[in-house]
Design a protein with these regions (language model features):
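Glycine-rich anion/phosphate-binding loop at the beta-strand->alpha-helix junction
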Residues: 164, 212-305, 310
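A short, charged helix-loop
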Residues: 197-213
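Alpha-helical support elements that line or immediately flank enzyme active sites
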Residues: 31-32, 105-117, 226-235, 240, ...
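Conserved hydrophobic residue
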Residues: 40, 45, 248-249, 367
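Short, well-ordered beta-strand elements within core beta-sheets of diverse protein domains
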Residues: 152, 220-228, 356-364
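Glycine-rich cofactor/substrate-binding loops
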Residues: 1-22, 26, 62-66, 83, ...
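Amphipathic alpha-helices that form helix-helix packing interfaces
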Residues: 30-33, 113, 117-120, 124-127, ...
Protein backbone atom coordinates (compact mmCIF):
# COMPACT_ATOMS: atom_id res chain seq x y z
CA UNK A 1 0.00 0.00 0.00
CA UNK A 2 1.23 3.51 -0.76
CA UNK A 3 2.52 5.56 2.17
CA UNK A 4 -0.32 8.09 1.80
CA UNK A 5 -2.78 5.64 3.36
CA UNK A 6 -0.40 3.82 5.74
CA UNK A 7 -0.32 4.68 9.43
CA UNK A 8 3.13 4.22 11.03
CA UNK A 9 2.47 1.29 13.38
CA UNK A 10 0.58 -0.75 10.79
CA UNK A 11 3.25 0.06 8.23
CA UNK A 12 5.92 -1.24 10.61
CA UNK A 13 4.07 -4.55 10.99
CA UNK A 14 4.08 -5.12 7.24
CA UNK A 15 7.66 -4.01 6.62
CA UNK A 16 10.11 -6.52 5.14
CA UNK A 17 12.23 -6.18 8.26
CA UNK A 18 9.36 -7.24 10.52
CA UNK A 19 8.21 -10.02 8.18
CA UNK A 20 11.65 -11.62 8.23
CA UNK A 21 11.84 -11.05 11.99
CA UNK A 22 8.66 -13.15 12.33
CA UNK A 23 10.11 -15.82 10.07
CA UNK A 24 13.14 -15.95 12.33
CA UNK A 25 10.90 -16.19 15.40
CA UNK A 26 9.28 -19.31 13.92
CA UNK A 27 12.66 -20.84 13.08
CA UNK A 28 13.95 -20.18 16.61
CA UNK A 29 10.79 -21.57 18.25
CA UNK A 30 11.02 -24.71 16.11
CA UNK A 31 14.71 -25.29 16.82
CA UNK A 32 14.34 -24.75 20.57
CA UNK A 33 11.35 -27.09 20.75
CA UNK A 34 13.26 -29.75 18.84
CA UNK A 35 16.24 -29.25 21.15
CA UNK A 36 14.05 -29.80 24.21
CA UNK A 37 12.85 -33.05 22.60
CA UNK A 38 16.44 -34.16 22.04
CA UNK A 39 16.19 -33.98 18.25
CA UNK A 40 18.51 -31.02 17.81
CA UNK A 41 21.68 -30.20 19.80
CA UNK A 42 21.00 -27.60 22.48
CA UNK A 43 24.09 -25.66 21.45
CA UNK A 44 22.63 -25.40 17.94
CA UNK A 45 19.36 -23.99 19.26
CA UNK A 46 21.34 -21.56 21.42
CA UNK A 47 23.48 -20.46 18.48
CA UNK A 48 20.46 -19.91 16.25
CA UNK A 49 18.78 -17.79 18.93
CA UNK A 50 21.88 -15.77 19.82
CA UNK A 51 23.50 -15.41 16.40
CA UNK A 52 20.46 -15.67 14.15
CA UNK A 53 20.01 -12.41 12.28
CA UNK A 54 19.71 -11.12 8.74
CA UNK A 55 20.15 -8.16 6.46
CA UNK A 56 17.14 -7.41 4.26
CA UNK A 57 19.31 -6.29 1.35
CA UNK A 58 21.33 -9.51 1.59
CA UNK A 59 18.14 -11.60 1.46
CA UNK A 60 16.97 -9.70 -1.60
CA UNK A 61 20.34 -10.15 -3.27
CA UNK A 62 20.27 -13.92 -2.71
CA UNK A 63 16.64 -14.16 -3.85
CA UNK A 64 17.56 -12.47 -7.12
CA UNK A 65 19.79 -15.48 -7.81
CA UNK A 66 17.89 -18.42 -6.32
CA UNK A 67 14.37 -17.14 -7.09
CA UNK A 68 13.04 -18.42 -3.72
CA UNK A 69 12.46 -16.04 -0.84
CA UNK A 70 12.54 -18.59 2.01
CA UNK A 71 15.76 -20.19 0.75
CA UNK A 72 17.23 -16.70 0.43
CA UNK A 73 16.19 -16.00 4.02
CA UNK A 74 17.59 -19.22 5.49
CA UNK A 75 20.83 -18.72 3.54
CA UNK A 76 21.23 -15.19 4.89
CA UNK A 77 20.55 -16.33 8.45
CA UNK A 78 22.90 -19.29 8.08
CA UNK A 79 25.69 -16.89 7.13
CA UNK A 80 25.23 -15.21 10.52
CA UNK A 81 24.87 -18.42 12.55
CA UNK A 82 27.83 -20.33 11.18
CA UNK A 83 28.40 -24.13 11.49
CA UNK A 84 25.35 -24.75 13.71
CA UNK A 85 23.12 -23.45 10.90
CA UNK A 86 22.82 -27.01 9.59
CA UNK A 87 20.04 -27.39 12.18
CA UNK A 88 18.21 -24.28 10.98
CA UNK A 89 14.89 -25.08 9.26
CA UNK A 90 15.28 -28.72 10.33
CA UNK A 91 12.18 -30.77 9.47
CA UNK A 92 10.36 -27.75 8.05
CA UNK A 93 9.03 -26.74 4.66
CA UNK A 94 8.83 -23.15 3.48
CA UNK A 95 5.17 -22.64 4.26
CA UNK A 96 5.56 -24.01 7.76
CA UNK A 97 7.47 -20.80 8.31
CA UNK A 98 5.55 -18.46 6.00
CA UNK A 99 2.02 -19.40 7.08
CA UNK A 100 2.87 -19.52 10.78
CA UNK A 101 4.69 -16.19 10.62
CA UNK A 102 1.80 -14.72 8.65
CA UNK A 103 -0.50 -15.67 11.51
CA UNK A 104 1.77 -13.65 13.82
CA UNK A 105 1.68 -10.66 11.48
CA UNK A 106 -2.10 -10.80 11.21
CA UNK A 107 -2.39 -11.17 14.98
CA UNK A 108 -0.50 -7.91 15.46
CA UNK A 109 -2.39 -6.15 12.67
CA UNK A 110 -5.68 -7.35 14.14
CA UNK A 111 -4.84 -5.90 17.54
CA UNK A 112 -4.50 -2.45 15.98
CA UNK A 113 -7.77 -2.80 14.10
CA UNK A 114 -9.60 -3.99 17.21
CA UNK A 115 -8.31 -0.93 19.07
CA UNK A 116 -9.46 1.25 16.16
CA UNK A 117 -12.95 -0.27 16.28
CA UNK A 118 -13.23 0.33 20.01
CA UNK A 119 -12.17 3.96 19.60
CA UNK A 120 -14.80 4.50 16.90
CA UNK A 121 -17.36 2.85 19.19
CA UNK A 122 -16.55 5.31 21.96
CA UNK A 123 -16.86 8.36 19.71
CA UNK A 124 -20.14 7.14 18.21
CA UNK A 125 -21.53 6.47 21.68
CA UNK A 126 -20.59 9.91 22.94
CA UNK A 127 -22.03 11.74 19.95
CA UNK A 128 -25.18 9.61 19.94
CA UNK A 129 -26.00 10.71 23.47
CA UNK A 130 -25.05 14.29 22.58
CA UNK A 131 -27.76 14.32 19.89
CA UNK A 132 -30.19 11.83 21.42
CA UNK A 133 -33.01 14.40 21.42
CA UNK A 134 -32.03 16.39 18.30
CA UNK A 135 -34.93 15.93 15.86
CA UNK A 136 -34.37 15.54 12.15
CA UNK A 137 -36.23 14.03 9.24
CA UNK A 138 -35.80 10.36 8.48
CA UNK A 139 -35.56 9.63 4.77
CA UNK A 140 -36.48 6.55 2.77
CA UNK A 141 -35.63 6.38 -0.94
CA UNK A 142 -34.06 9.81 -0.36
CA UNK A 143 -37.51 11.29 0.37
CA UNK A 144 -38.80 12.70 3.67
CA UNK A 145 -40.47 9.89 5.63
CA UNK A 146 -40.98 10.37 9.40
CA UNK A 147 -39.06 12.15 12.18
CA UNK A 148 -36.08 10.58 13.90
CA UNK A 149 -33.28 12.09 15.97
CA UNK A 150 -29.70 12.50 14.85
CA UNK A 151 -28.72 10.53 17.93
CA UNK A 152 -30.80 7.62 16.68
CA UNK A 153 -28.85 7.64 13.42
CA UNK A 154 -25.59 7.62 15.37
CA UNK A 155 -26.92 4.82 17.59
CA UNK A 156 -27.54 2.78 14.44
CA UNK A 157 -23.94 3.30 13.40
CA UNK A 158 -22.73 2.40 16.89
CA UNK A 159 -24.70 -0.84 16.79
CA UNK A 160 -23.32 -1.77 13.38
CA UNK A 161 -19.73 -1.05 14.41
CA UNK A 162 -20.32 -3.16 17.54
CA UNK A 163 -21.37 -6.08 15.35
CA UNK A 164 -18.29 -5.53 13.20
CA UNK A 165 -16.17 -5.63 16.33
CA UNK A 166 -17.66 -8.97 17.36
CA UNK A 167 -17.27 -10.39 13.86
CA UNK A 168 -13.67 -9.24 13.59
CA UNK A 169 -12.79 -10.70 16.99
CA UNK A 170 -13.97 -14.07 15.67
CA UNK A 171 -12.17 -13.66 12.33
CA UNK A 172 -8.93 -12.60 14.02
CA UNK A 173 -9.12 -15.58 16.38
CA UNK A 174 -9.67 -17.93 13.44
CA UNK A 175 -6.48 -16.59 11.84
CA UNK A 176 -4.43 -17.12 15.04
CA UNK A 177 -3.37 -20.54 13.77
CA UNK A 178 -0.02 -21.99 12.76
CA UNK A 179 1.07 -25.19 11.03
CA UNK A 180 4.36 -27.10 10.80
CA UNK A 181 3.04 -30.30 9.27
CA UNK A 182 5.38 -30.47 6.31
CA UNK A 183 5.18 -30.37 2.54
CA UNK A 184 1.82 -32.15 2.23
CA UNK A 185 0.48 -31.91 5.78
CA UNK A 186 1.19 -35.51 6.81
CA UNK A 187 3.58 -34.69 9.66
CA UNK A 188 6.23 -37.00 8.21
CA UNK A 189 9.19 -34.98 9.48
CA UNK A 190 7.75 -33.36 12.61
CA UNK A 191 5.55 -35.08 15.17
CA UNK A 192 2.15 -33.34 15.62
CA UNK A 193 2.85 -33.00 19.36
CA UNK A 194 5.98 -31.01 18.57
CA UNK A 195 4.02 -28.95 16.06
CA UNK A 196 1.58 -28.04 18.84
CA UNK A 197 4.40 -27.12 21.22
CA UNK A 198 6.01 -24.85 18.63
CA UNK A 199 2.72 -23.08 17.95
CA UNK A 200 2.04 -22.77 21.67
CA UNK A 201 5.49 -21.27 22.13
CA UNK A 202 4.52 -18.61 19.57
CA UNK A 203 1.14 -17.94 21.16
CA UNK A 204 -0.79 -19.62 18.36
CA UNK A 205 -3.26 -22.46 18.06
CA UNK A 206 -2.39 -25.37 15.80
CA UNK A 207 -4.38 -26.17 12.67
CA UNK A 208 -5.96 -29.55 13.37
CA UNK A 209 -5.24 -30.60 9.80
CA UNK A 210 -3.57 -28.86 6.88
CA UNK A 211 -1.96 -29.52 3.54
CA UNK A 212 1.24 -27.70 2.69
CA UNK A 213 -0.65 -24.58 3.74
CA UNK A 214 -3.27 -23.47 6.21
CA UNK A 215 -6.56 -23.70 4.37
CA UNK A 216 -7.55 -20.41 2.75
CA UNK A 217 -11.18 -20.35 3.87
CA UNK A 218 -9.78 -18.76 7.04
CA UNK A 219 -8.13 -15.99 5.07
CA UNK A 220 -11.25 -15.44 2.97
CA UNK A 221 -13.37 -15.06 6.11
CA UNK A 222 -10.83 -12.63 7.55
CA UNK A 223 -10.65 -10.39 4.47
CA UNK A 224 -14.43 -10.58 3.99
CA UNK A 225 -14.84 -9.30 7.54
CA UNK A 226 -12.48 -6.43 6.76
CA UNK A 227 -14.61 -5.71 3.68
CA UNK A 228 -17.72 -5.62 5.87
CA UNK A 229 -16.04 -3.12 8.18
CA UNK A 230 -15.04 -0.98 5.20
CA UNK A 231 -18.60 -1.15 3.85
CA UNK A 232 -20.00 0.06 7.17
CA UNK A 233 -17.59 2.99 7.11
CA UNK A 234 -18.62 3.68 3.51
CA UNK A 235 -22.24 3.73 4.69
CA UNK A 236 -21.44 6.33 7.35
CA UNK A 237 -19.41 8.42 4.92
CA UNK A 238 -22.10 8.28 2.24
CA UNK A 239 -24.69 9.54 4.72
CA UNK A 240 -22.47 12.44 5.74
CA UNK A 241 -21.89 13.29 2.09
CA UNK A 242 -25.64 13.61 1.64
CA UNK A 243 -26.14 15.60 4.84
CA UNK A 244 -23.45 18.05 3.68
CA UNK A 245 -25.14 18.77 0.34
CA UNK A 246 -25.90 22.48 -0.01
CA UNK A 247 -29.65 21.81 -0.24
CA UNK A 248 -29.58 19.75 2.97
CA UNK A 249 -26.68 21.05 5.12
CA UNK A 250 -27.70 19.30 8.31
CA UNK A 251 -24.13 18.24 9.09
CA UNK A 252 -20.73 18.70 7.53
CA UNK A 253 -17.12 17.78 7.92
CA UNK A 254 -15.04 20.12 10.04
CA UNK A 255 -13.37 22.69 7.77
CA UNK A 256 -10.26 24.32 9.21
CA UNK A 257 -9.41 28.00 8.75
CA UNK A 258 -6.50 27.22 6.42
CA UNK A 259 -8.28 24.50 4.45
CA UNK A 260 -9.09 24.98 0.75
CA UNK A 261 -11.90 23.23 -1.11
CA UNK A 262 -11.20 24.07 -4.74
CA UNK A 263 -8.46 25.63 -6.83
CA UNK A 264 -11.09 27.45 -8.89
CA UNK A 265 -14.00 28.10 -6.48
CA UNK A 266 -13.00 29.71 -3.16
CA UNK A 267 -16.43 29.10 -1.61
CA UNK A 268 -16.22 25.31 -1.75
CA UNK A 269 -16.38 23.16 1.43
CA UNK A 270 -16.34 19.62 0.11
CA UNK A 271 -16.82 16.34 2.05
CA UNK A 272 -13.40 15.14 0.95
CA UNK A 273 -12.74 12.85 3.92
CA UNK A 274 -16.07 11.07 3.44
CA UNK A 275 -15.40 10.71 -0.27
CA UNK A 276 -11.97 9.27 0.46
CA UNK A 277 -13.52 6.75 2.85
CA UNK A 278 -16.07 5.70 0.23
CA UNK A 279 -13.36 5.36 -2.40
CA UNK A 280 -10.91 3.29 -0.36
CA UNK A 281 -13.71 1.03 0.88
CA UNK A 282 -14.10 -0.10 -2.74
CA UNK A 283 -10.50 -1.32 -2.74
CA UNK A 284 -11.03 -3.40 0.41
CA UNK A 285 -14.23 -4.92 -1.00
CA UNK A 286 -12.43 -5.85 -4.21
CA UNK A 287 -9.74 -7.59 -2.14
CA UNK A 288 -12.41 -9.82 -0.61
CA UNK A 289 -13.17 -11.23 -4.05
CA UNK A 290 -9.50 -12.09 -4.50
CA UNK A 291 -9.46 -13.80 -1.10
CA UNK A 292 -12.40 -15.99 -2.13
CA UNK A 293 -10.54 -16.95 -5.32
CA UNK A 294 -7.64 -18.17 -3.18
CA UNK A 295 -9.71 -20.86 -1.46
CA UNK A 296 -9.61 -23.32 -4.37
CA UNK A 297 -5.97 -24.42 -4.60
CA UNK A 298 -4.75 -27.48 -6.51
CA UNK A 299 -4.36 -30.69 -4.50
CA UNK A 300 -2.18 -30.12 -1.42
CA UNK A 301 -1.17 -26.65 -2.59
CA UNK A 302 -0.23 -24.53 -5.55
CA UNK A 303 1.33 -21.10 -5.40
CA UNK A 304 -1.44 -19.09 -7.07
CA UNK A 305 -2.57 -17.64 -3.74
CA UNK A 306 0.86 -16.39 -2.69
CA UNK A 307 1.20 -13.39 -4.98
CA UNK A 308 -2.38 -12.38 -4.20
CA UNK A 309 -1.85 -12.46 -0.44
CA UNK A 310 1.33 -10.41 -0.69
CA UNK A 311 -1.00 -7.63 -1.85
CA UNK A 312 -4.39 -8.13 -0.24
CA UNK A 313 -3.41 -8.97 3.35
CA UNK A 314 -1.12 -5.98 3.95
CA UNK A 315 -3.28 -3.64 1.86
CA UNK A 316 -6.59 -4.64 3.44
CA UNK A 317 -5.37 -4.34 7.02
CA UNK A 318 -3.50 -1.10 6.27
CA UNK A 319 -6.55 0.43 4.60
CA UNK A 320 -9.04 -0.61 7.28
CA UNK A 321 -6.71 0.76 9.96
CA UNK A 322 -6.54 4.04 8.02
CA UNK A 323 -10.29 4.13 7.31
CA UNK A 324 -11.21 3.52 10.93
CA UNK A 325 -8.93 6.33 12.09
CA UNK A 326 -10.34 8.68 9.46
CA UNK A 327 -13.94 7.82 10.33
CA UNK A 328 -13.32 8.26 14.05
CA UNK A 329 -11.86 11.73 13.47
CA UNK A 330 -14.70 12.56 11.08
CA UNK A 331 -17.41 11.71 13.62
CA UNK A 332 -15.48 13.28 16.49
CA UNK A 333 -15.27 16.66 14.73
CA UNK A 334 -18.50 16.52 12.74
CA UNK A 335 -20.30 19.88 12.61
CA UNK A 336 -24.03 19.45 13.22
CA UNK A 337 -26.79 22.00 12.53
CA UNK A 338 -29.82 21.20 14.73
CA UNK A 339 -31.77 24.28 13.55
CA UNK A 340 -31.32 23.27 9.92
CA UNK A 341 -32.44 19.76 10.76
CA UNK A 342 -35.63 21.10 12.33
CA UNK A 343 -36.22 23.49 9.43
CA UNK A 344 -35.90 20.66 6.90
CA UNK A 345 -38.21 18.49 8.99
CA UNK A 346 -40.86 21.23 8.95
CA UNK A 347 -40.35 22.16 5.29
CA UNK A 348 -43.17 19.92 4.03
CA UNK A 349 -45.79 21.53 6.24
CA UNK A 350 -46.50 18.42 8.31
CA UNK A 351 -46.57 15.84 5.51
CA UNK A 352 -44.24 13.63 7.53
CA UNK A 353 -47.00 13.05 10.10
CA UNK A 354 -49.36 11.45 7.55
CA UNK A 355 -48.71 7.96 8.94
CA UNK A 356 -49.68 8.97 12.46
CA UNK A 357 -52.81 10.72 11.18
CA UNK A 358 -53.75 7.55 9.29
CA UNK A 359 -53.50 5.47 12.47
CA UNK A 360 -55.40 8.03 14.55
CA UNK A 361 -58.26 8.15 12.03
CA UNK A 362 -58.50 4.36 12.05
CA UNK A 363 -58.50 4.42 15.85
CA UNK A 364 -61.26 7.05 15.72
CA UNK A 365 -63.50 4.68 13.76
CA UNK A 366 -62.77 5.35 10.08
CA UNK A 367 -62.10 2.34 7.86
CA UNK A 368 -58.39 2.10 7.10
CA UNK A 369 -58.95 2.24 3.34
CA UNK A 370 -61.04 5.40 3.73
CA UNK A 371 -58.50 6.91 6.11
CA UNK A 372 -55.67 6.20 3.69
CA UNK A 373 -57.64 7.74 0.81
CA UNK A 374 -58.49 10.98 2.60
CA UNK A 375 -55.00 11.43 4.08
CA UNK A 376 -53.31 10.73 0.75
CA UNK A 377 -55.69 13.08 -1.07
CA UNK A 378 -54.71 15.96 1.22
CA UNK A 379 -51.05 14.95 1.11
CA UNK A 380 -50.93 14.95 -2.68
CA UNK A 381 -52.63 18.34 -2.81
CA UNK A 382 -50.12 19.73 -0.31
CA UNK A 383 -47.30 18.22 -2.35
CA UNK A 384 -48.49 19.40 -5.76
CA UNK A 385 -49.71 22.87 -4.76
CA UNK A 386 -47.06 23.57 -2.12
CA UNK A 387 -49.69 24.03 0.58
CA UNK A 388 -49.35 23.28 4.32
CA UNK A 389 -50.65 19.75 4.88
CA UNK A 390 -51.63 20.50 8.45
CA UNK A 391 -53.99 23.33 7.42
CA UNK A 392 -55.58 21.24 4.69
CA UNK A 393 -56.30 18.48 7.19
CA UNK A 394 -57.86 20.91 9.66
CA UNK A 395 -60.31 22.01 6.94
CA UNK A 396 -61.24 18.54 5.69
CA UNK A 397 -64.76 17.77 6.90
CA UNK A 398 -64.35 14.03 6.44
CA UNK A 399 -61.44 14.14 8.89
CA UNK A 400 -62.97 16.61 11.33
CA UNK A 401 -66.11 14.50 11.52
CA UNK A 402 -64.01 11.78 13.16
CA UNK A 403 -61.42 13.79 15.07
CA UNK A 404 -61.58 16.98 17.11
CA UNK A 405 -59.02 19.72 16.60
CA UNK A 406 -57.02 18.67 19.66
CA UNK A 407 -56.86 15.10 18.40
CA UNK A 408 -55.63 16.29 15.01
CA UNK A 409 -53.02 18.48 16.68
CA UNK A 410 -51.83 15.45 18.60
CA UNK A 411 -51.19 13.62 15.32
CA UNK A 412 -48.68 16.36 14.47
CA UNK A 413 -46.92 16.22 17.86
CA UNK A 414 -43.19 15.75 17.26
CA UNK A 415 -42.53 14.58 20.82
CA UNK A 416 -45.11 11.87 20.39
CA UNK A 417 -43.26 10.59 17.33
CA UNK A 418 -40.00 10.45 19.24
CA UNK A 419 -41.31 9.21 22.58
CA UNK A 420 -39.60 5.82 22.34
CA UNK A 421 -36.11 7.03 21.47
CA UNK A 422 -35.05 6.67 25.12
CA UNK A 423 -36.18 3.04 25.14
CA UNK A 424 -34.27 2.33 21.94
CA UNK A 425 -31.15 3.93 23.41
CA UNK A 426 -31.50 1.82 26.54
CA UNK A 427 -31.61 -1.28 24.35
CA UNK A 428 -28.69 -0.27 22.12
CA UNK A 429 -26.39 0.85 24.91
CA UNK A 430 -27.41 -1.60 27.64
CA UNK A 431 -24.02 -3.31 27.59
CA UNK A 432 -21.93 -0.17 27.12
CA UNK A 433 -20.67 2.42 29.55
CA UNK A 434 -23.34 4.75 30.99
CA UNK A 435 -23.50 8.14 29.34
CA UNK A 436 -24.93 11.49 30.34
CA UNK A 437 -27.02 13.22 27.73
CA UNK A 438 -25.57 15.98 25.57
CA UNK A 439 -22.00 15.13 26.51
CA UNK A 440 -19.50 17.78 25.55
CA UNK A 441 -16.60 17.04 23.24
CA UNK A 442 -13.47 15.83 24.98
CA UNK A 443 -11.26 18.57 26.45
CA UNK A 444 -8.67 19.76 23.99
CA UNK A 445 -10.65 18.58 20.96
CA UNK A 446 -12.99 21.54 20.57
CA UNK A 447 -12.89 23.33 17.23
CA UNK A 448 -14.18 26.64 16.06
CA UNK A 449 -17.40 25.93 14.18
CA UNK A 450 -19.89 28.10 12.29
CA UNK A 451 -22.59 29.94 14.21
CA UNK A 452 -25.66 27.95 15.27
CA UNK A 453 -23.80 24.72 14.80
CA UNK A 454 -23.20 21.97 17.31
CA UNK A 455 -20.09 19.84 17.06
Amino acid sequence: MIKRYTRPEMGRIWSDENKFRMWLAVEIAATETLAEAGLVPREAARAIRELGDFDVERIQSIEAEVKHDVIAFTTAVAEKVGPQSRWLHFGLTSNDVVDTAQALLLRDASRLILDDLRQLQQVLRRRAFEFQDTPMIGRTHGIHAEPITFGLKLANWFSEISRNLERFERAAEEMRVGKLSGAVGNGAHLDPELEEKICERLGLQTASVSSQVIQRDRHAYYVATLALIASSLDKIATEIRHLQRTEVREAEEYFSEQQKGSSAMPHKRNPVTSEQISGLARVVRSNAQAAFENVALWHERDISHSSVERVILPDSTILVDYLLAKTTALIDTLVVYPERMLRNLESTGGLVFSGQLLLDLAEAGMLREDAYRVVQSNAMRAWNEDLPFRELVMKDKEITSHMQRGQIERAFDLKRQLRNVDKIFARVFKDSEPQARHVEARPGRAHKTPAKASR
